[in-house]
Amino acid sequence: MSGLILKLGPKERILVNGAVIENGERRSRLAIMTPDANILRLRDVIHPEDAKTPVRRACYAVQLVLSGDATANETKHALLRNIEELSQVFVDMDSRQLIDTASGALSRGDHYHCLKSLRSLLPREERLLAVRN
């Protein structure tokens, strides 16, 4: 089995190419076989008013592509700039690896994995901002 594997909880919703799909009563596992399908877990959605930090803004931009509200071409250059800026702030090795993974995924047009890597930076960003305040 190849492709993206999604593990869904009961009643969890996902957006697949613009269609909202809700899981049933039990946990399930889905294999997405179409390589360029746009997938977004609705539990992971960042609302526009919450996109106030650099990582959240980058996540939100990727999310717009996955939801179909923006095209990959419209966001690619701005996202690459955002990711480059993040690489100047997050200098530890683990964060750099996540940033490199996000950048590589974006270059391949793999927005799902780009978002996944960027979301992994959110707790680190929160810690940095907490120290600053």
What are these regions (language model features)?
Residues 51-54, 58, 75, 98, ...:
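Helical mechanochemical/support elements of P-loop NTPase systems and associated helical scaffolds
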Residues 44-56, 63, 67-69:
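Catalytic, metal-anchored helix/loop core of enzyme active sites in primary metabolism
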Residues 19, 25, 73-81, 129-133:
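Short flexible/disordered coil segments
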Residues 1-27:
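Short, charged/polar N-terminal "headpieces" of proteins
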Residues 62-94:
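Mid-chain, well-packed structural core segment of small domains
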Residues 11, 19, 35-37, 67:
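Generic structural motif
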Residues 83-133:
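C-terminal charged interaction modules
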